[in-house]
Amino acid sequence: MTVIDEIYSSSSAIPTVALNDEAKMPVLGLGVAKLSDEETESSVLAALEAGCRLIDTAASYGNEAAVGRAIAASGIPREELFVTTKLGTSRQGFHSAQESCKESLDRLGLDYLDLYLIHWPAPKLGKYVESFEGMIEARERGHVRSIGVSNFTEDLLATVIEETDEVPAVNQVELHPRLNQAELRQVHAQHDVTTQSYSPLGVGRLIEEPTVTTIAAEYGRTPAQVLVRWNLQLDNVVVSRSSKPERVAENLDVFDFTLEPEHMEAIEGLHDGTRVLHDPMTFMGT
């Protein structure tokens, strides 16, 4: 199981986790799904200014170029950043996965990706295995350093591992108190796959949940900060999204407090299997 290298209870520094390929990935980053170009640039710049070094985008978001502009404007050395993007469903395939990777690099204005993910498995399409094989080739050519998947179930993950003899470094999935993905996280631990959580606030639905607001008040924190912290304390990597720069910085400020076991358990008790986004087994979009 992946383990957070360092978390200092009195520090705002964002620690890293070691992936199964020995790359180091920040445990908390910014996602830019559904943000306009203007919102993307302002959010990325705010995140970078606040110390964030993990930026997560996707070809289907349509804002890779905006991410690239913000990175360039920040002046932060490339080697200090961890940039993730994702392969769109319409580009799945051995050769098209490699071509799409290079197209994403062109839009981002980068020479390599830190992490490249299959965005959605689209099992009915039947191309996720050959797509992953194409990503292996892209890694061999130096276009990407780590490769992984997103929205993969236990069975789909097992198929990729069995048919390619390659263990994805990361599986990025919807994960929040209503959908804690406990069984999937156990499978990840068995294979040394890092669990990365998106939609940690349940698309905003959980910030008014009484259990969460009560705990937040006790710690003098926002509900969003408590939800992000809960996810981190499960040893997950987290990407959180906001179009408001002040919220971006606020959601990153979660490394100077620790939730007590009883509060972790109370939040865990909210699990009911509710998925607020798409079903990975049937979704054919993006």
UniProtKB/Swiss-Prot annotation:
The keyword NADP applies. It comes from the Bacteria. The keyword Coiled coil does not apply. The active site is at Y61. GO terms for molecular function: aldo-keto reductase (NADPH) activity. It holds the Pfam family Aldo_ket_red. Keywords: NADP, Oxidoreductase. Gene3D superfamilies: NADP-dependent oxidoreductase domain (3.20.20.100). Coiled coil: none annotated. NADPH binds at L201, V203, V239, R241, S242, R247, N251. Its EC number is 1.1.1.-. Belongs to the aldo/keto reductase family. This is Aldo-keto reductase MAV_4483. The lineage of its organism: Bacteria, Bacillati, Actinomycetota, Actinomycetes, Mycobacteriales.
